[in-house]
Amino acid sequence: MENPIDSLLLQPIYLSVLSFFLNLVLLLILFGSWLFKKRVACEDTDAIMNEEFKHISFSYNKLVLICCVSLSVFYSVLSLLSCLHWHTNGWPFLDLLLAALTWGSISVYLFGRYTNSCEQKVLFLLRVWWVFFFVVSCYHLVVDFVLYKKQEMVSVHFVISDLVGVCAGLFLCCSCLWKKGEGERIDLLKEPLLSSAESSDNEEVTAPFSKAGILSRMSFSWMSPLITLGNEKIIDIKDVPQLDRSDTTESLFWIFRSKLEWDDGERRITTFKLIKALFLSVWRDIVLSALLAFVYTVSCYVAPYLMDNFVQYLNGNRQYKNQGYVLVTTFFVAKLVECQTQRQWFFRGQKAGLGMRSVLVSMIYEKGLTLPCHSKQGHTSGEIINLMAVDADRISAFSWFMHDPWILVLQVSLALWILYKSLGLGSIAAFPATILVMLANYPFAKLEEKFQSSLMKSKDNRMKKTSEVLLNMKILKLQGWEMKFLSKILELRHIEAGWLKKFVYNSSAINSVLWAAPSFISATAFGACLLLKIPLESGKILAALATFRILQGPIYKLPETISMIVQTKVSLNRIASFLCLDDLQQDVVGRLPSGSSEMAVEISNGTFSWDDSSPIPTLRDMNFKVSQGMNVAICGTVGSGKSSLLSSILGEVPKISGNLKVCGRKAYIAQSPWIQSGKVEENILFGKPMEREWYDRVLEACSLNKDLEILPFHDQTVIGERGINLSGGQKQRIQIARALYQDADIYLFDDPFSAVDAHTGSHLFKEVLLGLLRHKTVIYVTHQVEFLPEADLILVMKDGKITQAGKYHEILDSGTDFMELVGAHTEALATIDSCETGYASEKSTTDKENEVLHHKEKQENGSDNKPSGQLVQEEEREKGKVGFTVYKKYMALAYGGAVIPLILVVQVLFQLLSIGSNYWMTWVTPVSKDVEPPVSGFTLILVYVLLAVASSFCILIRALLVAMTGFKMATELFTQMHLRIFRASMSFFDATPMGRILNRASTDQSVADLRLPGQFAYVAIAAINILGIIGVIVQVAWQVLIVFIPVVAACAWYRQYYISAARELARLAGISRSPVVHHFSETLSGITTIRSFDQEPRFRGDIMRLSDCYSRLKFHSTGAMEWLCFRLELLSTFAFASSLVILVSAPEGVINPSLAGLAITYALNLNTLQATLIWTLCDLENKMISVERMLQYTNIPSEPPLVIETTRPEKSWPSRGEITICNLQVRYGPHLPMVLHGLTCTFPGGLKTGIVGRTGCGKSTLIQTLFRIVEPAAGEIRIDGINILSIGLHDLRSRLSIIPQDPTMFEGTIRSNLDPLEEYTDDQIWEALDNCQLGDEVRKKELKLDSPVSENGQNWSVGQRQLVCLGRVLLKRSKLLVLDEATASIDTATDNLIQETLRHHFADCTVITIAHRISSVIDSDMVLLLDQGLIKEHDSPARLLEDRSSLFSKLVAEYTTSSESKSKRS
């Protein structure tokens, strides 16, 4: 018995009544609004309205207006035809008449609208009405189809009316959600009042997407100019339009942050709250894409629903004239809707994903800016960069899949409904079969989450170590340790690869189950029909098969969806966990505005500790006051807490107790210089505008003018990463210049003078501290006692406490700590006095002679010549298409490519079995009940099941082969790339920002690990699938080739037209990622400096700008892809419709209805499959750019061999340690100027040689050449008669020892830092620690030699790090030792002890010392003085000091005069 409610709902008359009353209500509201406006109208309303309408944007308001007018005209015509031609009356006629009146009223209302507050409510109501209209029209259309299926008469004009209503309603609903360029919702009913000038300005900055009309957006024609440009030239980054302002990172970030903080009063960020804030920041795109996904899903099932009717029509069961063409039209319209909604869905989803990535990158960066140092020790730079480079990208990629879970539920529901209509009760078995498939995947999904989490942790560990190694590559090469650390990274990769292997094989299992699912579900349903004795007819079978084929897509995609859900969940958890870390305490420092207090710095009962859990605080009992304008010096032994005190004033050290107040703006000069990659000028300005006069004064005070003249591009020279092309002294003085230029109130100097020579140090102290900063508050840490007498207050520190405080003469006799420091300094001066003849020159004379000397050598060296190039070059970018060689090399990585043909064979076999099973079901089932089936039901199901099992087995084999091959290729690519990176020369690292390398090691490697194998497999699967479909269709009606051949040609042409622009957009997007990673890494390393200058907003703006650069390239790359896919799907849809027309036009009986139905079943997916194949091919090429970039690094020129077997030196080499240099010429690159100019000298074996000279004169370059870090351009160096160029690098570097200028420690333990090669016993290590004055410090630690060392040794002071480096050489005991500013960061007393240790342990060794402290080289046997890359003097110190005109004598005089004069003034 029929349900009465269903009967009621299906009566057209009741639908007409409902529609009539909805129209009537809206008319009454519009009439009431009109009356209200008449009462409150102003005199100038008409003028405003007319002016407003004059500037209405055609792309929005007029299209909506035209749509409403068209509907009014349409319903008017339809009502007249109903009355005059069809003789319809009653409610249907009244409904059409009132609809015409309603849409006419809306049109008049829109044309004459006003902009008052009351109006907004009416505008909102119109939007609601449009949604209702769309829903009611859809319901009308459904009723039409149901009535049609019941073979009841349906009026044609009703069907036409409902179709027009659905299309117009969809357009009006979509228009409600479109946005405008200024970041606000487009009000389709209201435009802002803009003058012509303002409109013009707005058009100049608005992106093409925001200016595009509705038709342009629907067809993606707004991308056509850029794609056309890509065919005319190679697209550069300046050719790509900007993002719309509402889509910029800044706009989205502040929305995201406000939602996150508003929802999180406790500052506790959970994964759910993070998801919620992400959704609210891009909700419009997500909601619109969800609506489009819903319409797409419904439209996909129109064809299966009508499949039985189509087969019956071909079989001769025709219900009315032209039924075939009506069916073809319905199929065609459904496919058009499917095409349009899918493309817009994907585009909007990816747009939302880009927005989420932007806000996450900015939020992670923002967190990095507020992260205290103790939190950073738990999360290294590599881990944080991984969050930004991998996890944020993964969440962005999830936008492809975010609607899939609920869409799958909808699709399964629709499929079960259609199956029920086709198979009756037998379809019920499909439901438990589907549930069983889902349950079978549950354990695999849980394993996937576990494997993914472990995979990301292991990736973090690898990236952490990679980042640390790249940062310290120079010291690794100097020590000959690079291959040892490479093996550590390969071990970490091996652990990662273990989890990766489990992950990909688990994914293969999921893949196999779900790919076999459609066959399993269909076999279950058909078997149930057999058991229930439900007759199987070909029409119903084909409807079921068509449903299963549509269901195949989401089911096949389900493994990837599950994988992405798991990966995204892990990434969200990791980011949420990171964002939950404690921020830097804001209440550590009480900040007062400039000039509000006489006290600049005041600490009362202060206790500070880097580690809250430590029983012994870092600083305790801190009590002192610093008045405005005071000079305060801080001194003490290594590790006494000097740098920590400055960090406490900056607010970097957590406060345990006490009060700290700071009045005014701060500037900070770190002990280890932090220099940004960029121009020298940019480093000095540091965000402030150029003031030329002040800028020149700063350069003069910092003694930088001479250095800038030497640099190839003066202050426009681009500094390499970490200032690699500058000397230590130059970096320090640029850092000082940066602080001076800020014109702050309080200056904090952390021992900046130790990195420069005595003359430069004295000049800086006089011109900076006593000159430009004479009226400023200055607090400086120093180990140089000669700079103490000028201080208004001296703080002497020991073990984290201030032991003495006062002026120089007040504390000189009041305690032993200060006396020890001064005594050591006096002893050093006495050593110098015993060597020199007492000559001391006047400084003015020295300066004058230096100027003459500089001018003369500038002429000799040709430094006025034009420079030939910058050290840091733009990132390499391939041009044109990705070459076949890249594909060939990539595929050959796994077993020489032998597995690839096997995968193709398995896939072809699977395709044949799949088509065969469906062909079998179609062939043996009768067209109608009247025809006797040729085989029994048991045979029918048995053969189908056997074919399905065989095809499932092929799926399993294919999945395993793809996983195995992809894993092998990714692993080999990783190994080859890293091997070449570690074997690259230092010139590569000098010219390549670390971010570029990390980008390849993280993002590009992730693509190779997880994305590329699946992409390759899908291309093969889709291509073979398409060939199979075309084969099936051609077998039925070969005439379709007439249509397919030109369509395929057109598709190929479109692909070729598109790929030029798309390829370059993808490359530019890949390149634009590196600056983001590099900026991130650079910021984390200099975070203390950035915070001290209050530069967080500027750096936040920089990361947003860099993120926007990537987003706009990715956005337009996505737009280009959808531009192509839309056109391909449109062509395929026309081809599909043409095929249907051929089938229905054929004479009855010519075409087998069952086979024709099978052909249509396969053809239903042809448009999507063909477009997806082309899209995947293009995306594969874009993804192959990652492989291309990694392969670039497998072709990096390597250093000379590590070992040359034929010329290996004896184990005792070098036995004497004699170094002979002949005509040595050195430059840092072929395009860079010469640094050393023809040096010739000899370092006698067993003697100690000191190398001195002004900052930047070439001292460190000479040492780098000795270790072959830089290869000579000409000349040679011989050690004990062996040319160092003739032996392997490892044999050379492992026989030499060096304490480098920049002390380096690696994450690990004290033991692993002293003995990374594990060659020495604990007793030997303890002996080395005692000799380098660190033994007692390490014994205090609970874990002794296993005490932890954090990333870059951040939990040890710079001086202690330098002592650890000294401990390494004491263990190694090489015959030749180089000290490159080895004691620059330690106090004089410790320096004297170390010098004594070196004299004792290296008495018979050749020792080369570079030092700015004259006391460190004065007792050398020989002194070599360099100036601008030339040897000026080379003799014993005594002989040089005898010659009062020698440059060395003048250097010593400057040092002693400066020190003694300051001591006397005290």
UniProtKB/Swiss-Prot annotation:
Answer whether the UniProt record assigns the keyword Transport to this protein.
Answer: yes
Biased composition annotated in UniProt, kind: Basic and acidic residues? 844-863
What is the recorded name of this protein? ABC transporter C family member 6
Q: Where is the ABC transmembrane type-1 domain?
A: 286-567, 900-1182
Q: Where does ATP 1 bind?
A: 636-643
Q: In which tissues is it expressed?
A: Ubiquitous.
Q: Which organism is it from?
A: Arabidopsis thaliana
Q: What gene, per UniProt, encodes this protein? A: ABCC6
**Which residues are recorded as binding ATP 2?**
1253-1260
Catalytic reactions on record:
ATP + H2O + xenobioticSide 1 = ADP + phosphate + xenobioticSide 2
Stretches assigned to the ABC transporter domain: 601-824, 1219-1453
Q: Which GO terms describe its molecular function?
A: ABC-type xenobiotic transporter activity; ATP binding; ATP hydrolysis activity; ATPase-coupled transmembrane transporter activity
Q: Which residues cross the membrane?
A: 16-36, 63-83, 91-111, 128-148, 158-178, 286-306, 322-339, 400-420, 425-445, 512-532, 890-910, 937-957, 1026-1046
Judging by the UniProt lineage, the source's domain of life is Eukaryota
